[in-house]
Structures are given as C-alpha cells and as structure tokens.
Amino acid sequence: MPGPVRCWFSAGAAADLRYPGRVAARHVARGAAWVLACGLGPALLGAVLGRPWIAIGVVLAIATTGWLVLWLPRTAHAAFEAARYARAARRYRLIAATAFTAGRERAAVLSRAGCDDAAGRPAAAERILAGFDAGALDAAERVTWLNNRACVALDTGGDPGAALALIEQAVALRPDVPAVQHTRATALIAVGRFDDAIGVLEAMRAGGELAPALEAVRCRELARAWDHKGQPDYAADYRDRARLVAR
C-alpha cells in the first residue's frame, strides 16, 4: 500500500505511529497471534472432526491470510476509486487494526484520512493527519500526507497559496499520480492561475483513462476553470461530461 492518493484516513492510532518501538511491538504481537491461530486452527479441527479436516483447516488458513493481505487492500482501493468512501473507510480501518507492519498501518490510516476528506469530513481528516510526523514518513507516504493536507486546507477555506506549496512538494516526489495532479489543479484555480490549472487537468489523461470518479471531478474542475475565464460554453461541455461519467 499506500492507499489510494486523492483529496483525501482514529486520531489516537495515528498519534502512536510516531513511536516506532511501540508500533513494532504491537505488530509483532499481531503477527505472532495470526501465525498461532493459523497453526492451531487446523490442529483443533483435526482433533475434533478427524484427520481430513487438518487439510481443510490449512486451506482455510491460507485463504484467510490471502483475504487479509491481498483482497482487503485491493477492494478498499477499488471502493475509494468508485467514491464509496464509507465502505473504503471501514476496510482501511480493518487493515490498520490487523496490520503486521508499521508501513501497512500508516498507509491504511492515511487512506482513511482521504476517505474522511472526500466524504466531506475535513476536520476528521485533519485530526488524523496531525498525528503524523512528516519527517518519519517514506516518500510514498509523504506524497499521500502532503496531498491530503493540501486538500483539507482547500476544503476548509485555508490559505490556497499554502495548499499549493504543499501539493507542489507532492508533485515533485510523484509527478505521475493523476490524483495528485488533480489536487494541484484545484489549488491553481484557488490562487487564480486558471490557464495553468487547465493545462494540468488536460494532461491528467496522458497516461490513459482515469477511474470514473476521478474523471468526473477532473471535468468539474475544468468547468470551474473555464467559467473563471469567461467561457461558459466550454464549462457547460465539461459539466455535461462530468454528469455522463458519474452515472
């Protein structure tokens, strides 16, 4: 992971991420408990139901581990990209609660902040983000953190120039992430740089088709930018496209 990056992950859990020793101990305990459960489960099934159930128990343990490690993060990301923020937040919360490493937990918590902001709860997102020490994050996590801080600032009427400075740092780290470029364009509109914003928004599709939810917001931002430039016809075209994509 980290989770999906956009204008967008409990504050108490995030605060603990500052203390690697405590986090490491928690993750070691979780991993040991999981290994123990996967080992004891088949043995107990065999003792109660007979030897054939040992193999069934092993298969179930492998399947459950795959569900936790692979399926759950992928479906959380997919729910976010489909704008199903409540579902995505529940899955990220479960990932964080069962994470075996500090990085996996941080990524899930950052993604939960994204869900909160995208769902219209920027104050909740801000509380989570404030619990992180930015200097302790790796590059991918820092991109998510910077992006989400910029989005919260824009969504709460903060200084658009400060939001732009945050997102420019994220772009310098990961210029290839369309959702980060979308945040950059939103900040450019907020500071009145409409031509620059249009250029960024148009370039977002250079790498291929976007997820429908992201394409819809891209079109809405293009409509806003063209409105500001006094081009209502262009703006109307992009609003129509946004409605079509969002269906």
Summary of predicted features, one role per range:
Residues 56-82:
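Transmembrane alpha-helices and immediately adjacent membrane-cytoplasm interface residues
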Residues 70, 103-107, 140-144, 179, ...:
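Start-of-helix register in tetratricopeptide repeats
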Residues 85-86, 122, 159-160, 194, ...:
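TPR-repeat structural position
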Residues 82, 119, 156-157, 191, ...:
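Structural motif corresponding to the intra-repeat A-B loop/turn of tetratricopeptide repeats
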Residues 100-103, 137-140, 175, 209, ...:
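Short coil turns that delineate tetratricopeptide repeat
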